[in-house]
Amino acid sequence: MRKDLKYKILLCLLAGSVLAANTAFAAEYTETISSGNENYSAEIKSTDGNGNYTYNFGTDAKLIINGESRGISLDYTENSNTNKIIINEKLDISVTNKDNAKAAYGIYLQGDGDKEIDRSGGGNINVLVEDSELSAFAMGSGVYLTSPSPSDNNVINIGNADINVQVLNAKYGVEAYGLTSSGIGDNNKIIMGNGSINVKGLSVNEDSSGFYNVAVSGITAYDNTEIETGDVSIVATATGNENIVETVAHGITANGWMSSGPYLNPKVITGNGDITVTAQGGLDITNANGFKVVGGTIEKGAGNIKAEVIGGTNSYDVWAQGIYAEAGSLVTKGDGNITAIAQGGELTTTYGVRNSESTVNLDIVNISSVAVNDGNNTPSAYGIYAEGNNAEVNVQGGSISAQVNNVDGVTDNNNNDSYAIFGDRSSVINVNQRTTNKVVINGDIKTGGKAAVNLNLNTSDSVLTGSIEDKKGTLNLANGARWVATGYSEVNELTMNQGNIYVDTPFWADVSITKYSGTGNILFKADDTDKEGVVNIDTSSVIFTDAEKGSFINVGIANNSINTLDIDKTEENLNVLAGKVYYAGDNDNLNGKVVIKEGLITPEASADLVFDTANNNRGSVTNITGGNRVTQTMDAMKHIAETAIVAWRQEDSTLSQRLGDLRESDGGQGIWVRMSRGEFNYDSQYENQYNFFQLGYDWARGNWHYGAAVSHNDGETTYAQGMGENRSTSLSLYGTWLGRNGHYADIVLKQGRLSNDFDIYTEAGHTHGDYDMWGTSLSGEYGRKIDLKDGWYVTPQAQMTLMRIGGEDFTTNNGIHVRQDSLESAVGRVGFEVGKAFDKKGSIYAKASLLHDFAGSADTYLSLKGLSNSYSQDIGDTWWEAGLGFNYKVNDSSYLYADVVKTFGGDVETPWQWNVGMRWAFV
């Protein structure tokens, strides 16, 4: 009976609303509100009941409140006996207040003890406060939790939700919040599932007196409270005007500030999701913060953070901060971008990450800080800024950049108040420590006091571009990582393991390294040389104070027009380069090489690096050695020229390849077509695959057949240093004599236009060129088909082919002028075919030949920026060829022929080639 009474007997009278129930005598209360798809317009609250309230809403039900300030409310000041409000099923909540009330809330809990609102079924929450013209203050919050006692354990669980809060057109102060928790209770907590939070505040104040503000925040935890969410995206927008003293926008706030005593520790834990924060307008202060943490904790998963500020006409202090932490806070964030952008105001400042006496731990993040210089302000930009004692920032990888831009988006190179990383007092900033992630830093690094920046760049795509002024930190460059030094630098400790330093500094801005260890490379930028290729290095010097025993440096230069072709000029250039390095420590500890790397047409040169104590510890060279005079670029160009004549040579086939067994053709005239496909290569230097097409016509006069043919060859070449294409289109005239007793002779004259284009990639750079030339060949073949028994036959044969490809002058994309001599070739061939004929229906055969190219050498001359070099090539060679083929008479007027061949023993090999053709004869 008691159980039935518990659920079925209502000990109250409903006055005006079933939700404002008098349940003074019931421990629990359950009410079914709707059957689904219905709207309800009364506030859900408890005024004088005991225990728990449970409300059953149907599917897709909506709670729509107009003219009141709360959707769901549990307020101990109205009834301290109710412990819990439970909403079964999903419930959308909409609260609109256009009256003069100061505030509106979707869900409101003010608890003294252990109070709870459970709407874990989820649903959207919309709050709108508008036109509060007479209010001194207007506020809206999607969810609001507060309590007065340290022992409180109040909880709001809202489930999955999209929260939209707008406080618009208020005359004076404006505040808009998504989730808000406050109070000193140790376990006050808001729990949210997945969803989104969108908050917007707008003021229309036109009065210049008083202190008015616009403040918005997506998630806000004060005092000792905690807010925990799933994956949530946040958009927060604050818009003021020139009479609003302060306009601020925050994505997530955890503020444990206390006027006296230690700071409390509010905590926000949230999953993945983007945060976009925008503040616009404002008279004195306009700022935006992705995170703002004061003596609290924020733990966030992956996602992007963007904080943007646009100052008003008369704004003074304008700043944007992706993450701001102070007063012993702890921030942890997953992968994603962190962007801060600010423009307008008199003082315009951006911080990607700003840390004051706190700890910030970041996974792989891309930090970008941009302040805009409009010509009337003082802009400053910082990627990471750490200050105060015990401040620590740990970044696992990604990118960090800071820059001041003009209004057109172009970087203002005249503004020096921007730093990718800045540390002060005893702060520590660690980047990629104990990990192997890509790191890209654009901007200067500077520390003051006892601060230290520890950088670990250990992948080939990691690069730091900027100056370093850090007397306490460390820099590690390994596995091809680069530091492009652009200004005066002081490095406390440098370790290299095949790392690289590119010196691109003004001549007065030395790079000083206190302690060095390892093996690495220093490359100086030198844009200019004189007409004889003597280098002019106008960068600063690199100065080593001390080095660990066994340390080594390679000193080099980036310039393709340094003279290493002349021994005297080579020594002069090596000494100029060595003289840019100074070392004051123990000479046994640091050794090195000075290397002028191979250019496009200049060979490598190197020497040992020594330091002269009598010359202020300046570097000089000894034991000079030179490299191969033919550079990699030149060697590739030589092979490109070879492919042209080898491809031309491949086209000149034997009579049987071109026409098959002409004796089997009836009629006085004939047309024929053939296709050939194959490959040739030279060691591991290049490989060419080609397609050849030929169409011909001939007629008979006595024992002679006279004809003409057009052909096209299209080849693609892969080189060790690049790729290319070769093409040719030709016209051939031929005469073929078929004598008695199997004798035959074949004469072919061919003229064609050849083209080559290529791309070469070497350490010296990319070279592209294209050129055309004429080719001519004359071929004569003689042989005799000797019939044996049972249809067998043998055909000994000899052939001589003379070829010439004309010379050509051309200029590559990078300025190399090439003058190429003509190339000649004379290929002699002796060989035989042995086969068997089948009742005049055709034959099959095997063949073998010995070939020799009696070619002479050809010279090529190259020049670049006043320097000249050349190379010679000789394609003479001897090789064997073997193959199989057949002739098949399809009918009285047509026959089909084909063969496959392979070469052996030559420098240039043909691993495979097939040829197929067909001839049609007619009277």
Protein language model annotation of sequence segments:
Residues 629-794, 901, 906:
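Outer membrane beta-barrel translocator domains of Type V secretion systems
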Residues 732-737, 819-923:
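Outer membrane beta-barrel transmembrane domains
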Residues 424-425, 438, 442, 447-583:
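Extracellular beta-strand/loop-rich repeat segments of large surface/secreted proteins
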Residues 30-46, 62-78, 98-116, 122, ...:
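Extracellular beta-strand/beta-solenoid scaffold signature
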Residues 27-29, 523-545, 554-698:
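Outer-membrane translocation/initiation segment of Type V secreted surface proteins
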Residues 689, 716, 720-722, 755-772, ...:
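Solvent-exposed, glycine/polar-rich loop segments of beta-barrel outer-membrane systems
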Residues 341, 672-676, 707-711, 746-752, ...:
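Transmembrane beta-strands of outer-membrane beta-barrel proteins
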Residues 462, 667-671, 691, 702-706, ...:
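Outer-envelope beta-barrel architecture signal
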